[in-house]
């Protein structure tokens, strides 16, 4: 994993030798399970290090992941960004949410094989789990790398946050347009865009843009959110 070590050092992200070893185990598990269930189209080691692992670890540049905060990762898939964040700082208390049970099975094996504590994977849809008292308004940070519009992600994620908690959305170059289209959602869900961190990642001469939107919850979520998927599709915020 020398490639990952050099990539992270360039961004001043420090990983322990143990963390680097666990990233290698994690990578092999992804490749093994990718033959059974669809986890990622990126299977080349160098590309995985750049487009998955480093990309997720850029979240640590916010300075928000250096203690024992409670973190929820919505639509976690193969565990991105939850597992890389946990390997960066094992003190984080992380919950991973995904709607596909096969991925939950995979994530539980990752947790076991990497010997991770204070991290769990739960099966469910965000718009349903977000209405449950045990999860609602109970996290310091919610992250999502899911491919969905910002307004949709806001309705899926903001209900999970404590007041003054932060939602971190990972977006590509068209984020300004998404923010503009999400003004109504931001207002109705009692949150505001606090900051945007911009990064450029290079791999084999190809440069990709990554933007981390930091959105703060400034008031309690109204009881009617999140709505069911039928309502969300019929009338998006």
What annotation goes with each model-predicted range?
Residues 103-105, 175, 179:
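Short alpha-helix immediately C-terminal to the canonical SAM-binding loop
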Residues 57-148, 154:
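Conserved SAM/SAH cofactor-binding pocket of Class I
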Residues 2-68, 72, 105, 109-119, ...:
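Class I SAM-dependent transferase core
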Residues 127, 172-176, 201:
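Short "lid" loop at the C-terminus of a central beta-strand within the Rossmann-like core
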Residues 89, 161-163:
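Helix-to-beta-strand junctions that scaffold the AdoMet/dcAdoMet cofactor pocket
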Residues 164-174:
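Conserved beta-strand signature within the Rossmann-like core of class I S-adenosyl-L-methionine
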Residues 43, 123-125, 195-197:
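Short loop/edge segments at beta-strand edges and connector loops
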Residues 180-237:
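SAM/dcSAM-binding transferase cores
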């Amino acid at each position: 994993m020398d490639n990952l070590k050099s990539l992270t050092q360039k961004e001043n992200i420090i990983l322990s030798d143990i963390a680097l070893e666990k990233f290698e185990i994690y990578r092999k598990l992804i490749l093994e399970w990718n033959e059974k269930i669809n986890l990622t189209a990126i299977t080349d080691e160098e590309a995985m290090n750049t487009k998955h692992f480093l990309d997720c670890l850029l979240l640590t540049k916010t300075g928000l992941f250096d203690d024992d905060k409670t973190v929820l990762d919505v639509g976690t898939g193969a565990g991105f960004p939850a597992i890389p964040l946990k390997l960066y700082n094992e003190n984080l208390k992380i919950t991973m949410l995904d709607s596909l049970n096969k991925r939950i099975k995979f994530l539980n094996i990752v947790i076991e094989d990497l010997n991770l504590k204070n991290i769990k994977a739960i099966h469910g849809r965000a718009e349903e789990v977000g209405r449950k008292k045990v999860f609602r308004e109970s996290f310091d940070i919610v992250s999502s790398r899911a491919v969905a519009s910002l307004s949709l992600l806001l309705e899926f994620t903001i209900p999970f946050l404590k007041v003054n908690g932060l939602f971190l959305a990972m977006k590509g170059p068209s984020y300004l347009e998404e923010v503009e289209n999400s003004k109504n959602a931001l207002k109705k869900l009692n949150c505001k865009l606090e900051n945007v961190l911009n990064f450029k990642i290079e791999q084999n001469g190809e440069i990709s843009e990554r933007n981390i939107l930091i959105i703060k919850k400034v008031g309690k979520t109204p009881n009617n959110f999140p709505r069911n998927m039928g309502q969300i599709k019929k009338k998006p915020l």
